[in-house]
Amino acid sequence: MSRVSPLKINQLTNRCSTKDLSFRTTKDLKPVRDVIGQDRAVEALKFGVEIGSEGYNLFVLGPSGYGRHSVVQNYLNRLAKTKPVPSDWCYVNNFVDSYKPLLLKLPSGTGRKLAEDMDRLVEDFRNSVPAAFENDKYRMRRQEIEHEVSEQQDKALEAVKKRAKKKNITLIQTPSGIALSPTKAGEILDQDAFRKLPEKERKKLQKDITALQADIEKIIHHIPRIRRSIQRKVKDLNQAVTRAAVSGLIEDLKQEYSAMDNVQDYLDKVQEDVVESAEELFLSKEGPGQGGGNMPTEEMQVASMVRYRVNVLVDHGEAKGTPVLYEDNPCYNNLVGRVEHISHMGTLLTDFTLIKPGMLHLANGGYLVIDAMQLLMQPFAWDSLKRCLRSREIRVESLGQSLSLVSTVSLEPEPLPLDVKVVLVGDRMLYYMLHDLDPEFSDLFKVAVDFEDHMDRSSRNVQMYARLIATLIQKDDLMPFDRGAVARVIEFSSRHAEDAEKLTMEMRSVADLLRESNYWARQGKATLVKSDHVQNAIDQAARRLGRIQTRWREETVKGTFIIETEGERVGQINALSVIQLGGHAFGHPGRITAQVRMGGGEVIDIEREVNLGG
């Protein structure tokens, strides 16, 4: 069995020759626009984004520091500019059931315009309708209707009076109502005079009084029916006046939205509700005034008019393509939205204007990027996201409603149809854990975008890597690096990859080295970063983290750690342990010993002893 040949010192590091770099400084290099060394990941990203089938959401997996977020964001931002702008979404009042607001889907940019138009329309209502109620013609007609009650009552009583007069009976108006009293020769008889009348005449008068009282009671019982009829006529009059005042305003607005059937239908419902609620909105119920009713206060009127506002949930008026959003705090409410409340007189109140969107609403029709670990750390966020993706709709409800923990009455907004690509970003362990432990995960996130840890150190890739270094330098506005400095960074990259034939794709550590090299170059009053500055940055980083390494070496020199470097010992060898603490790795020699004894002359096969070999 031949022994392994020892390595020479120059074989321990794969040096990068400056002759292989065809530039003088990084200012001569064109920045990299596309991702390098991540062909597999980019292909998967392109596939997952473009396939439109259900369940093809993406999980971007790889270690942190490899540019996962930036690669995904840059790719999606470029793609989003070529895609159409999605629709606006608004919540409006449900005039049948105000606890269940309705959705309006509108072309992009129309939502805000409709909201502004409705605000102006409401202001026009507040000006034109009260003016119509102040019209003399309306006042006269209202007074005519209200006079019908007294006229009909007076007419009926007058007929009774005539019949009573023929029978020598008169009607007397008292505080408690109408009383009947017998008369003789035009004068009212008191009880003594009535008792002195002949018995036959008394009985006839009593009979006539009883009959007349029955007639009066019929009239009194009929008065509420007359008043209800009058109230209906007044209401019809108020509605007719309101309809005449608002119909022209609404028709003008309908002309602007003639191509949108849902807006036309909504405006028709607004008109019917304004007409139906005319007295509540424009006339108080305190009693008749100069125009038949007092105007409500401005505060009351504004509060009542809220029902005609438009709550613009999603506005894409200024968008240039599909939305690409990143949620750094993916809690339950931030994902699915919420219904806010206001405190009034010690009571919590809400309405459809207090419905607030979540990131799923804002990203609908586009892309939503979420950090997977942050998502899983938020209570109920993961389950709510899966529920929305599975049902393809967003329900705005509180956690209490979702978990059936509260019984208070709240809003139940109409669910919004969901069409979004969700991109989760996390490490490999998290991806494999979700894939194995969550049965719904593989149905909802069918595309894995796996980032490479390394790229081959070929001549072509070295040139591309140099351009990538130049891109990072330009991005952070650093001083230019010469060829020697770039070569030293490439050597650092191979060492970081722990393979002389590879280059690391963890660009965070490379970018840190570039910034620190730039710092040391500026400290030396240099105008160009050279290899010495890069080496100094590497050495200084190792020094900052090298306290434990220095202490261990001191203990070895003192003899606290006993290491023999000469001769041979049975059952004992020296080894090199690699210690990694806080991002700093260093080697430390150690002694490995084993118990030994004289054997019986037989060769022991370890694999056979543990039943792994024959």
Regions found by a protein language model. Give the residues of each.
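Non-catalytic accessory segments flanking P-loop/AAA+ NTPase cores
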Residues: 1-614
